């Protein structure tokens, strides 16, 4: 008997301890802010965090490749701008040298190439401009004469020859510059194509590295998740086996009502072991219900008697109230008759007083002449 009780106490203590541990774990899950998992899928959140990290790593690698390409493009643009500035500088230098060598003031012409008749329009150099009104005897040039025609023609031919040579030189220089620009453009295009090919290879290698890293991360994450699921499954199986063992060996499945009796407090029961009330308890409850029923019936009879008394008192009060109202109506009628006779007497007295005033006091009525004597002057 002692051994059986000892085993029962041990099982009960173990069950109580297990229940207390489960309650502590549940409180930790609910009340611990850092590890609260109520209503939250921790696995899904971890997956989202991993996906976000992979996406951020891919974006960082893409931004690094884009930054490298941008730097290379900037270098190429700077080279082109520098080449354009050098070419502009050389052209400006050549123009300045041409102006300094070929367009000096000492080499200027006295006539315009586009106005050959300038000599005809001008005056001879030996003509004095001091004489304001020259006469016919001062004529020095007549129609049909052109003393400097041969010189002027030679000068025009020389000017034409010079202009033609200069145009040929400019065309040759423009052709040379165009060839240089085409060569530079071809070199730049080849350099940009090579750079684009290099950047494409870099991007492809970055993409391959990113895909490899993503595949490795997915494999590692899948392995971790599989291990976690396996551990969770094993823990759940152990918990189920322990629960089955506990249910099969505990007092929960027994039909003995004594297992619900509390050992330290006899007036209390164990809710998880309670199998129902005993016949004595049911009889005591029925007896108590019968006592309550009799008390309720006595209370109902007392309320009924009280209601009857209240009704009779109400009826007597209503009868007395009706009698008082009848007396009040009679008194009001007597008062109205007395008030009417008094008002009639007062009206007769007032009429007699008014007749006396009209016939005796107010006999001398003022005429229009009496009223016209007032306000007849400005004073």
UniProtKB/Swiss-Prot annotation:
Record's compositionally biased regions (Basic and acidic residues): 9-21
GO cellular component, as recorded: axonemal A tubule inner sheath; sperm flagellum
Coiled-coil blocks: 85-111, 161-241, 280-304
InterPro entries documented for this protein: RIB43A
Entry keyword set: Cell projection, Cilium, Coiled coil, Cytoplasm, Cytoskeleton, Flagellum
Domain of life: Eukaryota
Principal localisation: cytoplasm
Region spans: Disordered: 1-21
Keyword rRNA processing among UniProt keywords: no
GO biological process: flagellated sperm motility
Quaternary context: Microtubule inner protein component of sperm flagellar doublet microtubules.
PANTHER family the record matches: RIB43A-LIKE WITH COILED-COILS PROTEIN 1, RIB43A-RELATED
Name this protein carries in UniProt: RIB43A-like with coiled-coils protein 1
Species whose genome carries this gene: Macaca fascicularis
Taxonomic placement: Eukaryota, Metazoa, Chordata, Craniata, Vertebrata
């Amino acid at each position: 008997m002692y051994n059986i009780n000892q085993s029962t106490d041990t099982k009960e203590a173990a069950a109580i301890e297990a229940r207390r541990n489960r309650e502590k774990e549940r409180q930790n899950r609910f009340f611990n802010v850092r590890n609260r998992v109520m209503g939250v899928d921790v696995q899904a959140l971890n997956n989202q965090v991993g996906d976000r990290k992979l996406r951020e790593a891919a974006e960082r690698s893409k931004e690094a490749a884009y930054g490298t390409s941008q730097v290379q493009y900037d270098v190429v643009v700077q080279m082109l701008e520098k080449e354009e500035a050098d070419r502009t500088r050389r052209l400006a230098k050549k123009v300045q040298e041409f102006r300094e060598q070929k367009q000096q003031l000492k080499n200027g012409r006295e006539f315009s190439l586009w106005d050959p008749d300038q000599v005809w329009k001008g005056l001879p150099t030996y003509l004095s401009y001091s004489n304001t009104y020259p006469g016919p005897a001062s004529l020095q040039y007549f129609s049909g004469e052109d003393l400097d025609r041969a010189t002027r023609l030679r000068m025009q031919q020389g000017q034409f020859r010079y202009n033609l040579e200069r145009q040929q030189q400019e065309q040759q220089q423009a052709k040379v510059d165009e060839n240089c620009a085409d060569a530079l453009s071809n070199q730049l295009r080849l350099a940009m194509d090579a750079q684009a090919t290099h950047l494409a290879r870099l991007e492809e290698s970055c993409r391959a590295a990113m895909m490899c890293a993503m595949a490795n991360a997915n494999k590692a994450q899948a392995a971790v998740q599989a291990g976690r699921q396996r551990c969770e499954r094993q823990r759940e199986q152990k918990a189920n086996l322990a629960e089955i063992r506990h249910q099969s060996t505990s007092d929960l499945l027994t039909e003995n009502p004594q297992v619900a009796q509390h050992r330290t407090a006899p007036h209390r029961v164990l809710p998880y072991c309670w199998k129902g009330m005993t016949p004595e308890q049911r009889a005591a409850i029925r007896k108590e219900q019968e006592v309550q029923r009799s008390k309720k019936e006595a209370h109902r009879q007392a309320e009924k008697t009280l209601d009857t008394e209240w009704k009779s008192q109400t009826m007597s009060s209503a009868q007395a109230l009706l009698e008082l109202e009848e007396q009040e109506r009679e008194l009001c009628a007597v008062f109205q008759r007395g008030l009417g006779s008094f008002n009639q007497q007062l009206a007769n007295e007032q009429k007699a007083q008014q007749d006396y005033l009209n016939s005796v006091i107010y006999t001398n009525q003022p005429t229009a002449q009496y009223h016209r004597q007032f306000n007849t002057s400005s004073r």
